[in-house]
């Protein structure tokens, strides 16, 4: 075995010595450039891999979000003089910029679609509570009952809001993004009673919700309502009325223990 290995080594050395490249007068220069090419190729691959990694995460998500916002009419793309693509906010985009919520896009779509037009202040607070409430325990995301019945304006507005959220989830899925958190209507009837002037004890009676969880949700809801109230001018018919309604709803929610509490 050793003799065969030695013979193979001798043969390889002979072949290397007799290789045509040995007669090239620029052999050393070619070797120098060959090593440089290999080094630059490795560096290019490293940079390419890093770019692909970034594109596959934050940058890719950003591009997908911009595509969704453009498709929904919140952004417009323009090609500038240098041939680069610039994006500008539309009138709808300016509204979205003034709303700060995990469900800001769903909320803007609902506002622009007139989802809340038939609601009073109590109903608006009740329906919008679904966008800020996060249940600690598993549930079906439905209230014990819909004030006004299943054919009333609150139930109808809730159904429309669910549909809007489902449509946006489909868009996210089509673009390879994670689904948005679904709205949870489990606190709807409780929040309605609170906005209607009920005491904390009577509103929570018969539920497993703690006072702290309710107050936390109510403060977040009041913040969203106040954002709508001051986001004028709202770019749709009835926007001024809805802004006033949101202001009234915020006052109805942010009262008593909710107003006094420092819970965020």
Describe the role of every protein-language-model region.
Residues 1-264:
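Non-catalytic terminal extensions of ATP-dependent helicases
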């Amino acid at each position: 075995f050793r003799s065969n290995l030695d013979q193979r080594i001798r043969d390889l050395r002979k072949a290397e010595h007799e290789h045509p490249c040995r007669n090239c007068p620029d052999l050393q220069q070619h070797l120098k450039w060959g090593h440089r090419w290999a080094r630059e190729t490795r560096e290019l691959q490293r940079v390419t891999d890093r770019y692909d990694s970034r594109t596959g995460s934050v940058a890719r998500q950003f591009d997908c979000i911009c595509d969704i916002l453009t498709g929904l009419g919140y952004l417009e793309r323009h090609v500038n003089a240098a041939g680069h693509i610039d994006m500008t906010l539309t009138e709808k985009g300016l509204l979205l910029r003034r709303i700060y919520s995990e469900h800001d896009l769903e909320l803007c779509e609902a506002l622009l679609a007139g989802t809340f037009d038939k609601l009073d202040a109590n109903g608006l607070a009740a329906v919008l509570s679904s966008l800020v409430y996060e249940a600690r325990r598993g549930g079906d995301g439905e209230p014990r009952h819909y004030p006004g019945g299943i054919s009333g304006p609150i139930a109808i507005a809730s159904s429309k809001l669910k549909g809007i959220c489902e449509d946006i989830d489909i868009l996210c899925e089509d673009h390879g993004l994670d689904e948005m958190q679904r709205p949870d209507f489990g606190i709807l009837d409780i929040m309605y009673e609170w906005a209607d002037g009920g005491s904390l004890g009577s509103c929570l009676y018969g539920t497993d919700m703690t006072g702290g969880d309710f107050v936390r949700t109510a403060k977040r809801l009041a913040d969203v309502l106040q954002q709508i109230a001051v986001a004028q001018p709202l770019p749709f018919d009835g926007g001024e009325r809805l802004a006033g309604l949101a202001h009234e709803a915020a006052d109805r929610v942010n009262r008593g223990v909710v107003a006094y509490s420092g819970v965020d």
